[in-house]
Every structure is written in structure tokens, then in C-alpha cells.
Amino acid sequence: MNCGEIYRTQEKIPERGHKPGFYVIVSREFIASNDDVSTVICAPVYRETLGLRSEIVVGVEDGFPQESAIRCDFLTLMLKSKLTHFVATLSSEKQRQLNRALSYALQLTV
């Protein structure tokens, strides 16, 4: 697993209305790719876009069935074993957008 990869869960998740969902890994590479670490931090993907600075819009070209939003305000810790279906990897541009959205959501200044 790597930062910027998109996965779909098979399990129905209570926080998602008991439906499977899409998640983007946002953990740093050392954590995401380390087989000894069982969890990663993920940003959930929602079908509804709200136009927030803390979200980025993605679509079919990014591996999603329809236009959706990666929401950085709702980061969640996921077991790697629940991220069962690899979908795609974000493009370099989408990764830059995600980094800006994460920075905004977490109020980080560099």
C-alpha cells in the first residue's frame, strides 16, 4: 500500500450508512508500505461534493464510478485488511490537491 492509493472496502461500514466505501490512503509512505503496521490513515470519499477547501473533486478519470469528493475533514484510521479492492492511484496533480486539502483541514502552516 502507498500514499495516494484508492481502495474500496467490501465490508459494510457503520459510519458510511452500513455501505461499502472508497478510501484514499494519506499515511506517510513508511507507514502505508510497512507490512508490520496493520493500520493506515485514510480520507473517505463521498458522492456529494460540497465545494469545501478541505475536499478535492474526483471522477471517472480517477477510478470512481461518478463525480465524488475526497473529504479531508473526516480522516479515519482503517485496518489495512479492510481495504480489499485496489481501485487506482491518484495522479500527481490530484496528490498535490489532496496535500493542500489536508493542510487546510488540519490547519497546518509550513
Where do the language-model regions lie?
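Compact nucleic-acid interaction/catalytic patches
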Residues: 16-60
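C-terminal terminal-subdomain/extension
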Residues: 62-110
